[in-house]
Amino acid sequence: MTRVRNDQFDAAKGLDRGRSKPVEAAWYLLKCCVFLTPLPFPSRLKCALLRMFGATVGSGVVMKPRVNIHLPWKLAIGDHSWIGEEVFILNLEPVTIGAHCCISQRAFLCTGNHDFRQPDMPFRSQPIRIEDGAWVGAQSFVGPGVTVGTEAVISAGSIVTRSQPAQKVCAGNPCVPLKDRWSRL
């Protein structure tokens, strides 16, 4: 017999969704119609809709098609940042993306996890912070509690489970700093 008890998992325990069920349902419908579609709705429209639902979004933000934002009221994006196609932001806790950042195609920013040491596997969520000028490469995973430092580069396909320092090129599984971003070749 297994010690894991998924039947005892309580999705409401330890999680504040931040808005009422009707607001969440309205966001879900809008997200399906405007954000998850391959149709290239203008970034300005998407940013305005995010603001209507409580997100903080700076000027000049570019948002490509098929971006999946779980809870917009727990999202802040700085000026002139770029959110690539099929980026998934699972923000059960706040996600802060600084100014002039690039979150590349299919990157996954995930604030949620489970405590696997307990049989009922309760939520264990922490915020994510992507500082100014950072670049999260395509198909990278950024996990709960991570800060990506100012002007850091996370190479494509990296698994980031610990904070990464400023102005470094970081890569791998697990992601580690490899070299200075601005060093001469």
Region roles according to the model:
Residues 135, 155, 170:
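Short glycine/serine/threonine-biased micro-segments
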Residues 166, 171-174:
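Acidic, glycine-centered active-site loop in nucleotide-sugar glycosyltransferases
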Residues 62-64:
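Conserved short histidine dyad/triad with adjacent acidic residue
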Residues 1-55, 59, 100, 133, ...:
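Terminal amphipathic alpha-helical/low-complexity segments used for targeting or macromolecular assembly
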Residues 58-59, 98-99, 149-150, 158, ...:
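Secondary-structure boundary/capping motif
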Residues 38-47, 66-77, 82-147, 173-174, ...:
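Flexible, glycine/small-residue-enriched loop-and-beta-strand segment within the central core
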Residues 138-153, 158-162:
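Beta-rich strand-turn-strand
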